[in-house]
């Protein structure tokens, strides 16, 4: 194994000089002697010098320290030994529960499955969240993005999806915490532990306080573990169906921006790295389903300054099957989950995939909400009295629909005090169809707020009239 010596340190970027005939390849991992630090080669500068990013703090590094070339990319433990464990970007345990007992190690830089290996599925994945199941249904083996600005509920929505899908889903889950709060990682661990599904989850964290190299690579570490479960065939020649949760894809882009600037690349639009689309593609193209197994991924995407046209969320949009857009305006009305039904989309929204009843109900709900949106300006200026009877009826139904989209979450029970509700797709379609048909025009709109099924809204209305 060849050895080089450190010649320059600029923050997280370290230059290492090797003998000219032993220069390491791009993406090879280097180990710095006398420290725990791993460096990943990013560029070859010529004259035997390579530019690397440090996966760990560079505190205490100095020039002339020796770095050994491992002659392979960063490799992480994969397989059953990773389940129930919390690991860092290099696959080292950070839960103080001993070494990870893994039978195999895979490199984190891998190719995407070939065209002939990929498969597409139209099977729906029920989430139990009304607004998602009705307006932007998820496909099994699909990619879902939760878009939202700061504090509109991306992580809470993701936790509820984990609660509803991962607990009911008999398969395995991988959670990659990319540049998020350590507290949220801790909450997630205890949530999984309390619900006895920890032995089906592998957790990989590279949190906010870590150097950009860690945050840039931790998503690939989590993805590699998920790929192993998908591709490793059992006795029947089948892989597994895996759930991959990534929180937050924006921090992955941001880490790439930091590294790009340190590597001396010229920034592109809004200061992002010029390789933004390529970096996103490298990650997203690997998150796919093959003929042997599937990866269903749910990714939170932070939207800077609530601007969906920002290059980072805009680049992410192209890779997704379903987009769930969280709106600050809806959150300000106290309607949670704050999903914007007019801005959320799904490729599954096709009568041949979801059925005619579901499709027609979703279209009617969308039309009613769109009409209300158009009438809002008139109402603000002239008031409700100036509207025609038909428009008044549309507004009344739209307000009921808006409130009926709200739902108490299981993971928010500790904050709200009201028990969480899981609503089946059948009940969701039935409820919204009845509202659009005018069956509940006589009920007050408050009765539809924070309930599960339509029967609960009727019950709440009866209680309200009894109190009155």
Curated annotation (Swiss-Prot):
<dbReference type="InterPro" id="IPR027417">
    <property type="entry name" value="P-loop_NTPase"/>
</dbReference>
<keyword id="KW-1278">Translocase</keyword>
<dbReference type="InterPro" id="IPR020003">
    <property type="entry name" value="ATPase_a/bsu_AS"/>
</dbReference>
<keyword id="KW-1003">Cell membrane</keyword>
<dbReference type="Pfam" id="PF00006">
    <property type="entry name" value="ATP-synt_ab"/>
</dbReference>
<dbReference type="Pfam" id="PF22919">
    <property type="entry name" value="ATP-synt_VA_C"/>
</dbReference>
<comment type="subunit">
    <text>F-type ATPases have 2 components, CF(1) - the catalytic core - and CF(0) - the membrane proton channel. CF(1) has five subunits: alpha(3), beta(3), gamma(1), delta(1), epsilon(1). CF(0) has three main subunits: a(1), b(2) and c(9-12). The alpha and beta chains form an alternating ring which encloses part of the gamma chain. CF(1) is attached to CF(0) by a central stalk formed by the gamma and epsilon chains, while a peripheral stalk is formed by the delta and b chains.</text>
</comment>
<keyword id="KW-0547">Nucleotide-binding</keyword>
<dbReference type="InterPro" id="IPR000194">
    <property type="entry name" value="ATPase_F1/V1/A1_a/bsu_nucl-bd"/>
</dbReference>
<keyword id="KW-0375">Hydrogen ion transport</keyword>
<feature type="binding site">
    <location>
        <begin position="148"/>
        <end position="155"/>
    </location>
    <ligand>
        <name>ATP</name>
    </ligand>
</feature>
<dbReference type="InterPro" id="IPR003593">
    <property type="entry name" value="AAA+_ATPase"/>
</dbReference>
<protein>
    <recommendedName>
        <fullName>ATP synthase subunit beta</fullName>
        <ecNumber>7.1.2.2</ecNumber>
    </recommendedName>
</protein>
<keyword id="KW-0139">CF(1)</keyword>
<keyword id="KW-0066">ATP synthesis</keyword>
<dbReference type="InterPro" id="IPR050053">
    <property type="entry name" value="ATPase_alpha/beta_chains"/>
</dbReference>
<keyword id="KW-0813">Transport</keyword>
<comment type="similarity">
    <text>Belongs to the ATPase alpha/beta chains family.</text>
</comment>
<dbReference type="GO" id="GO:0016887">
    <property type="term" value="F:ATP hydrolysis activity"/>
</dbReference>
<dbReference type="GO" id="GO:0005886">
    <property type="term" value="C:plasma membrane"/>
</dbReference>
<dbReference type="GO" id="GO:0045259">
    <property type="term" value="C:proton-transporting ATP synthase complex"/>
</dbReference>
<keyword id="KW-0472">Membrane</keyword>
<dbReference type="InterPro" id="IPR036121">
    <property type="entry name" value="ATPase_F1/V1/A1_a/bsu_N_sf"/>
</dbReference>
<dbReference type="InterPro" id="IPR004100">
    <property type="entry name" value="ATPase_F1/V1/A1_a/bsu_N"/>
</dbReference>
<comment type="function">
    <text>Produces ATP from ADP in the presence of a proton gradient across the membrane. The catalytic sites are hosted primarily by the beta subunits.</text>
</comment>
<keyword id="KW-0406">Ion transport</keyword>
<dbReference type="InterPro" id="IPR055190">
    <property type="entry name" value="ATP-synt_VA_C"/>
</dbReference>
<dbReference type="Pfam" id="PF02874">
    <property type="entry name" value="ATP-synt_ab_N"/>
</dbReference>
<dbReference type="InterPro" id="IPR024034">
    <property type="entry name" value="ATPase_F1/V1_b/a_C"/>
</dbReference>
<dbReference type="GO" id="GO:0046933">
    <property type="term" value="F:proton-transporting ATP synthase activity, rotational mechanism"/>
</dbReference>
<dbReference type="InterPro" id="IPR005722">
    <property type="entry name" value="ATP_synth_F1_bsu"/>
</dbReference>
<keyword id="KW-0067">ATP-binding</keyword>
<dbReference type="GO" id="GO:0005524">
    <property type="term" value="F:ATP binding"/>
</dbReference>
<keyword id="KW-0997">Cell inner membrane</keyword>
């Amino acid at each position: 194994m060849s050895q080089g010596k450190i010649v320059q340190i600029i923050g997280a970027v370290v230059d290492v000089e090797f003998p000219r005939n032993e220069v390491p390849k791009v993406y090879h991992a280097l180990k710095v002697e006398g420290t725990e630090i791993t460096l990943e080669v990013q560029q070859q500068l010529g004259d035997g010098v390579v530019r690397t990013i440090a996966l760990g703090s560079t505190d205490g590094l100095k020039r002339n320290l020796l770095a050994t070339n491992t002659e392979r990319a960063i490799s992480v433990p994969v397989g059953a030994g990773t389940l129930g464990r919390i690991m860092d970007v290099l696959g080292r345990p950070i839960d103080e529960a001993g070494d990870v007992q893994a039978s195999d190690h895979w490199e984190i830089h891998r190719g995407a499955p070939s065209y002939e290996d990929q498969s597409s599925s139209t099977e729906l994945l029920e989430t139990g969240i009304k607004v998602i199941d009705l307006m932007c249904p998820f496909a099994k083996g699909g990619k879902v993005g939760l878009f939202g600005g700061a504090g509109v509920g991306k992580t809470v929505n993701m936790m509820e999806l984990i609660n509803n899908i991962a607990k009911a889903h008999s398969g395995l889950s991988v959670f990659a915490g990319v540049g998020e709060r350590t507290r949220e990682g801790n909450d997630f661990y205890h949530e999984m532990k309390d619900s006895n599904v920890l032995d089906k989850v592998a957790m990989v964290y590279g949190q906010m306080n870590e150097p950009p190299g860690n945050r840039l690579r931790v998503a690939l570490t989590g993805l590699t573990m998920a790929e192993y479960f998908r591709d490793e065939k059992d006795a029947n020649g089948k892989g597994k169906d895996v759930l991959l949760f990534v929180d937050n894809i924006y921090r992955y882009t941001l880490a790439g921006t930091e590294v790009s600037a340190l590597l001396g690349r010229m920034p592109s639009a809004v200061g992002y790295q010029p390789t933004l689309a390529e970096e996103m593609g490298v990650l997203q193209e690997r998150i796919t389903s093959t003929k042997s197994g599937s990866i269903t991924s749910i990714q939170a995407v932070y939207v800077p300054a609530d601007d969906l046209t920002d290059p980072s969320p805009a680049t992410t949009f192209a890779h997704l099957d379903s987009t769930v857009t969280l709106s600050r305006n809806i959150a300000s009305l106290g309607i949670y989950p704050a999903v914007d039904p007019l801005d959320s989309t799904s490729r599954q929204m096709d009568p041949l995939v979801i059925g005619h009843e579901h499709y027609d109900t979703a279209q009617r709900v969308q039309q009613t909400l769109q009409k209300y949106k158009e009438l809002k300006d008139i109402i603000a200026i002239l008031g409700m009295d100036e509207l025609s009877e038909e428009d008044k009826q549309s507004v009344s139904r739209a307000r009921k629909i808006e409130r009926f989209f709200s739902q108490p979450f299981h993971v928010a029970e500790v904050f709200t005090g009201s028990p969480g509700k899981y609503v089946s797709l059948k009940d969701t379609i039935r409820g919204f169809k009845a509202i659009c048909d005018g069956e509940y025009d006589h009920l007050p709109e408050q009765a539809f707020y924070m309930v599960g099924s339509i029967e609960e809204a009727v019950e709440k209305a009866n209680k309200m009239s009894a109190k009155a």
